[in-house]
UniProtKB/Swiss-Prot annotation:
Principal cellular location given in the protein's record: membrane
Signal peptide: 1
Superkingdom of the organism of origin: Bacteria
SUPFAM superfamilies reported for this sequence: OMPA-like
Protein name: Opacity protein opA56
Molecular function GO labels: porin activity
Stated role: Implicated in a number of adherence functions. OPA proteins are implicated in pathogenesis and are subject to phase variation.
Family of this protein: Belongs to the opacity porin family.
Cellular component terms (Gene Ontology): cell outer membrane
Organism this protein belongs to: Neisseria gonorrhoeae
Keyword annotations from UniProtKB, A to Z: Cell outer membrane, Membrane, Signal, Transmembrane, Transmembrane beta strand
Length: 234
């Protein structure tokens, strides 16, 4: 790939498809840590989602080994769940008492940024194709929050005298919980892919990377990414 054997600084731009796996661990309601972190819902325990995001890298090619610094931002994940349950408490003398419980839960998770440093080794099969493997360490910033509201309503339905039933509200209660965290951690990952030299200076890159962002308080976050990009060596 030229008289310098492929050595020199380079820049790379990628478009990545990320599969994101978020595991949020809540303590048991009867456990010793039940008051430290609220048990909100199983719905937020194990989230699998995906996003498409750009990534930019700046590095140096030593003619076999490459080192690079990269930066990426991910899409914010958010979802909500609403459930309602009505339980009959009493039914006698044409009077029926029910308890209505409503749960509204909203969760967001945002990998705000990932700043990484990678070391990659290129296998030169021929003048065009170069498979590669590598390792990556990254400083990640993550924000996640959960809002939960539980509302209970006790009401009486009276059908006395055979007339149209009349509903009376007897009691209302509402409990709200909010949890928000912004965490920064150093995580580790692996990289693999194939580069195809379009010209001595321009390379088409298809890659895969796995990254474990670390244990973010009571949240574990892992990403699998497939990317397509171009690398230009100066």
């Amino acid at each position: 790939a030229g008289e310098d054997h492929g050595r020199g600084p380079y820049v790379q731009a990628d478009l990545a498809y990320a599969y994101e796996h978020i595991t949020h661990d809540y303590p048991e309601q009867t456990g010793t840590k039940k008051d430290k972190i609220s048990t909100v819902s199983d719905y937020f325990r194990n989230v699998r989602t995906h996003s498409i995001h750009p990534r930019v890298s700046v590095g140096y090619d030593f003619g076999g080994w490459r080192i690079a610094a990269d930066y990426a931002r991910y899409r914010k994940w958010n979802d909500d769940k609403y459930s309602v349950d009505i339980k009959e408490l009493e039914n006698k003398n044409q009077n029926k008492r029910d308890l209505k419980t409503e749960n509204q839960e909203n969760g967001t998770f945002h990998a705000v940024s990932s700043l990484g440093l990678s070391a990659v080794y290129d296998f030169k099969l021929n003048d065009k194709f170069k498979p590669y493997i590598g390792a990556r360490v990254a400083y990640g910033h993550v924000r996640h929050s959960i809002d939960s509201t539980k509302k209970t309503t006790k009401f009486l339905t009276s059908s006395y005298g055979g007339l149209n039933p009349t509903v009376y509200t007897e009691e209302n209660t509402q409990n709200a919980h909010h949890q928000s965290n912004s965490i920064r951690r150093v995580g580790l990952g692996v990289i693999a892919g194939v580069g195809f030299d379009i010209t001595p200076k321009l390379t088409l890159d298809t890659g895969y990377r796995y990254h474990y962002w670390g244990r973010l308080e009571n949240t574990r976050f892992k990403t699998h990414e497939a990317s397509l990009g171009v690398r230009y060596r100066f």
